[in-house]
Each structure stands twice: as structure tokens, then as C-alpha cells.
From Swiss-Prot:
Superkingdom: Bacteria
GO biological process, one term: phosphate ion transmembrane transport
Sorted UniProt keywords: ATP-binding, Cell membrane, Membrane, Nucleotide-binding, Phosphate transport, Translocase, Transport
Leader peptide range in chain numbering: none
Main localization (coarse): membrane
EC number: 7.3.2.1
Family to which this protein belongs: Belongs to the ABC transporter superfamily. Phosphate importer (TC 3.A.1.7) family.
Family matches, as Pfam families: ABC_tran
Membrane topology classification: Peripheral membrane protein
Record-linked SMART domains: AAA (SM00382)
Compartment(s): Cell membrane
Protein's recorded name: Phosphate import ATP-binding protein PstB
Main enzyme class: translocase
Length: 254
């Protein structure tokens, strides 16, 4: 039996002023999956990713047309509170961005505190659960009150994942989360994705096609603002329907 849709993009276009950066994208995402967006630089994959939690609201001149449905509700509806929506759709950026003046513990629970949660025992439970979910607990359990900036780059990125997990998002967006990390740290985060999809749904932008093939259930190939192909990862990489996809995944351009 096919699982229900969690996210459905319908005729989504994104503009910066008069320039159309993403063109009429239609894309469905099912719960409990890892979904990779691939394509050359400037193809629209990150632009589309940022639309899924309304980050373009913060960009002067940017606008999004079409519909992005989360559990059947258009996230761009005037009745939707963007702040509340972003608690349902978390984001991990390309470079680790822990809050520099906060401890490891305070970084993880920052989102909960903003919603008014103050109970220390509850915050500690959430911090431990989230750090375990990000495969970081054993490395930092004795350093919770130390500055987050004292962690290594790979640890800081997993801390950012824990911070996103703390508010229990339905979707976790990841914009090239390993591009600034060494191979060992990259491997830890890749290993983590299989466990994370048990508790959330992941959409990851990556320039690394080997990474997309290793970690994702579905792959979407973007090119010059168009969604060229979307399907099961094995199919996209071994038997693509579009010759442009075949040319890209085989390394003939990119």
C-alpha cells in the first residue's frame, strides 16, 4: 500500500524580481523517506528547498507562485503562521551555525525555550533525546555547559541537526550539510540519515552524486530551474528516463 503524501508541490515557480529561478515544479514527498535534490550549481535545487519553509519571505523581491501543501494545507496560505510552520519544517545549512554565545545544551533547546518551555527536567530530556538522535550524545554528554564553538566542525553540524530535531519537525531540510566537513564527519552524518528517517522526513540538497545514491530513497534532478526528473534513486541513477539526467549522473556535464 502506498503511503500518503506528506508534502506536495504543485506548479511551483520562484522569482527574484523578473527572473524566474524555478519553473512550474510538481513534486511529491512521502513520510519516512530521504529525498535528494541534485543538479549543477545554479540549477534551482536550493532555491526550491528554501521555499519549503518559506525562507524566501525574508528575501526582498522574491516571490513564490503555485502551492506547497504540507499535510494538505498550503504553507503559503494567509492563514498560516510562518513561524509555527517553520517548527514543522526544520533546516540545516551548508556550514555549521551553532549560536556562538550559547552552551551545547542551550543550543539544542533554544527553539523550545522560544515557545515558552521552561521546565529544566523536560528540557534535559529533550536535549538528550535530540543529541542521541544526532549521534552526538556520547561525545558531548560531559560538555553540555561548555561553549558550542568548542566542538569540531563535524560535531557542530550534528549539534545543528540536534537543535532542529528538538522541536520534532515533520520535515528536515538539509542544504549540502556535509560540503564543509571532512570525510570522517561526512560519513557519520550519512550514516545518521537512515536512523533519522524513522522519526522525520528528510530532503537533502547535495552536489555529491555518490552521496545522493548512498543515502536517498528518491532523487530529483534540477537543471536551469526545471525539475527534469524525479523518481526512485536506483532508477534515476541506473535507468533514467531523460537523456539530460543520464548525461549528468554519468558525469558528462556538471
Amino acid at each position: 500500500m502506498t503511503s500518503p503524501l506528506l508534502l506536495s508541490a504543485q506548479d511551483v515557480s520562484i522569482y527574484y524580481g523578473d527572473k524566474q529561478a524555478v519553473k512550474n515544479v510538481n513534486l511529491d514527498v512521502r513520510p519516512g523517506t530521504v529525498n535528494a535534490f541534485i543538479g549543477p550549481s545554479g540549477c534551482g535545487k536550493t532555491t526550491f528547498l528554501r521555499a519549503i519553509n518559506r525562507m524566501h519571505d525574508l528575501t526582498p523581491g522574491a516571490r513564490v507562485t503555485g502551492s506547497i501543501l504540507l499535510d494538505g494545507q498550503d504553507i503559503y496560505s494567509p492563514s498560516v503562521d510562518p513561524v509555527a510552520m517553520r517548527r514543522r519544517v526544520g533546516m540545516v545549512f551548508q556550514k555549521p551555525n551553532p549560536f556562538p554565545t550559547m552552551s551545547v545544551f542551550d543550543n539544542v533547546v533554544a527553539g523550545l525555550k522560544l515557545t515558552g518551555v521552561k521546565n529544566r527536567d523536560h528540557l534535559m530530556q529533550v536535549a538528550e533525546r535530540s543529541l542521541r538522535g544526532a549521534a552526538l550524545w556520547d561525545e558531548v554528554k560531559d560538555r553540555l555547559n561548555t561553549p558550542a564553538t568548542g566542538l569540531s566542525g563535524g560535531q557542530q553540524q550534528r549539534l545543528c541537526i540536534a537543535r532542529a530535531l528538538a522541536v520534532e519537525p515533520e520535515i528536515l531540510l538539509m542544504d549540502e550539510p556535509t560540503s564543509a566537513l571532512d570525510p570522517a564527519s561526512t560519513a557519520k552524518i550519512e550514516d545518521l540519515l537512515g536512523d533519522l528517517k524513522k522519526v522525520t522526513t528528510i530532503i537533502i540538497v547535495t552536489h555529491n552524486m555518490h552521496q545522493a545514491a548512498r543515502v536517498s530513497d528518491t532523487t530529483s534532478f534540477f537543471l536551469v530551474g526545471d525539475l527534469v526528473e524525479h523518481g526512485p534513486t536506483d532508477q534515476v541513477f541506473t535507468n533514467p528516463r531523460d537523456e539530460r539526467t543520464e548525461a549528468y549522473v554519468s558525469g558528462r556535464f556538471g
